[in-house]
Amino acid sequence: MVKITSGNKKKYGTIDVFNLSEWGRPIARITAQFLEKKPISVIQVTNIHFLLSLFCAWLILEGYLLESCFLLVIKGVIDAVDGELARIRERPSHVGRYWDTVADTIGLIAVMCAFGVVLDWEIALTSIIILATLLQYSLFNHFSILMRTLGSGDSTSRIDERIRPIAQPWESQTTVNIFHTIYVLFYSWQDSLVSKLSGKGSEKLRFELTVSSSLGYGMQSIIIFLLALTQNLIYLPHLVLGVNGFLVALVLLRSRVG
């Protein structure tokens, strides 16, 4: 067992998990180690993957579907760098956690709207796909946070974010308050809904985390890239609403039967 120190602190603490969406974390960890002493902040890394998402949405609208889907995979790796960098530097950030969620959501909406335009989706279908994807991400995040709690890993994220957190010494409480308010207004309903639908879960939550991790961005971006590579992006709604919907039901059922 690897000793958890400032240099090698793991996301899930002492628990070894099989997370399908975190295939890129070793790359992210190496990148974070390279950036540890560099004059770049965690927020700046988040800004990079946020801008990359918007760039991918523009590429989709311009017809560069394969290129944009490939960059969306790269975006997922960069998305993991900010968290790894915060862990290595031992400077967790509430602002960073909230901004990362907001940035991911804006990027998701931009990309899915771009797909909707190119693939000629109805506005209602685009809206449903965005909503379903957000809930699927929330389900994965729910069990990811529970697993971190079990393993005494990263404790920055919480199942219930309605209670305003105390700013870290290196953060501004005013800024934390602003981002916390934004998070509660737009995202707390997702957390509450997932918490109500899911049960206590199995003893070690490995089944729930592994299956729900296939709904996470890392795995979904790979699948979408494969759809683009095989020129089958027309089946994207079937993926989000069909296959992923079945996996959501499977995870929720397993979490209730224990």
Identify the meaning behind each predicted range:
Residues 1-26, 146-258:
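C-terminal membrane-associated helical module and adjoining short loops/tails
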